[in-house]
Amino acid sequence: MVPAPLWINDVSMLPDGGFVASHMMPREISRTIFDRKPNDRVETGYVVEWHKDRGWSKIEGTDGALPNGVQVSEDGKTVYSNHYFSNQIVAIDRESGQIKWQTPVEGAPDNINIGDDGQLYFPTHLTSLREIRNQCLGKSVDYCVGEFAVYAVDPQNGRPTQLFRSQGRFFGSSTAAAKIGQSVYLGSVGGDRIGRIDAP
């Protein structure tokens, strides 16, 4: 069980068998999430790590405005954290807490996946969480219509490439992007569809 006040969103495995996780905000204020304005930059959470012998601990230097997607480098030394309400991805040294780089993107970044080419892949929301909720959360819909973009980011230097920008037609509100071979596959907030775009 995750102890209060942690409110976990995304997780990523560490080489030693532990894992890191994004703590978005304290549970007691979680109901305010849909009232927040995009890119408000109000810091509410951070990244934590868990080990069987030590339990939960905060990773210093990871405070951010609604930390969402999180990944860790293959050697476990670097944490990559998407700050949903400050429209950026940040790389942090896991041991020292020092920021290695931070990169602004268009929209609010969601979950991160490491592609088979080693790049960081994620979608960003170009509509507010309130709009996403009103359009498709908890509703029986074929697909969500929220506009989104898809990014690839170089983990070494934070250089971003916007791969795709949608208008939400036929598939929208993407929450995950996974590169496999020549394609990037997309998940969504709701509906019964997955998306696919060509890989770079």
Please annotate each region the language model reported:
Residues 25-26, 85, 126, 190, ...:
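Residue-level signature of beta-propeller blades and closely related beta-rich strand-turn architectures
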Residues 37-52, 142-156:
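Beta-propeller blade signature
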Residues 50-54, 93-97, 154-158, 198-200:
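Short loop/turn segments that connect beta-strands within beta-propeller blades
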Residues 28-29, 47, 87-89, 129-130, ...:
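Structural signal for beta-propeller blades
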Residues 21-42, 123-145:
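Short, conserved, GDST-rich strand-edge loop motifs in beta-rich repeat architectures
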Residues 2-19, 25-27, 41-46, 58-78, ...:
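Beta-rich, blade/repeat-based domains predominating
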Residues 20-22, 81, 121-123, 186-187:
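Residue position within the beta-strands of beta-propeller blades
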Residues 173-200:
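Blade-level signature of beta-propeller repeat domains, shared across WD40, Kelch, NHL, RCC1
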